[in-house]
């Protein structure tokens, strides 16, 4: 073994992992999983928002006396143009609120990640990898 490799092994062996350290490492992992889950959820909601916006545009150019099928759960309701516009507007607003909430949650996780990285890298230096 080279001298630098031996030094690295010695450094790893010298740093003991206590229960509090392990809890922080586990928390980092759980937060990382949650962040990826939120990112997938955000992507799905953004796709739904795009579809809803397209539907809203289609309604705009439709005849006023037309009837539209609106999906509610597993059922379809036949509604007039005004009701359809109102329902889609409410749905779009809900999606936008959900996306803002997800963004806020992701930012909170990023802040906690930064805090944990500072603490854990200070103790374990290069013997721990907290990158995604």
UniProtKB/Swiss-Prot annotation:
InterPro entries tied to this protein: PFD_beta-like, PFDN4, Prefoldin
The organism's place on the tree of life at top rank: Eukaryota
Pfam entry (one): Prefoldin_2
Cellular-component GO terms for this entry: cytoplasm; prefoldin complex
Keyword set, alphabetical order: Chaperone
Entry annotated with the keyword Chaperone: yes
An example Gene Ontology molecular-function term: unfolded protein binding
Residue ranges crossing the lipid bilayer per the database entry: none
Matching CDD domains: Prefoldin_4
SUPFAM superfamilies referenced in this protein's UniProt entry, alphabetically: Prefoldin (SSF46579)
Keyword Cell inner membrane: no
GO biological process, alphabetically ordered: protein folding
Oligomer and partners: Heterohexamer of two PFD-alpha type and four PFD-beta type subunits.
Family statement: Belongs to the prefoldin subunit beta family.
The protein's role, per its UniProt record: Binds specifically to cytosolic chaperonin (c-CPN) and transfers target proteins to it. Binds to nascent polypeptide chain and promotes folding in an environment in which there are many competing pathways for nonnative proteins.
Protein name (database record): Probable prefoldin subunit 4
Gene responsible for this protein: pfdn4
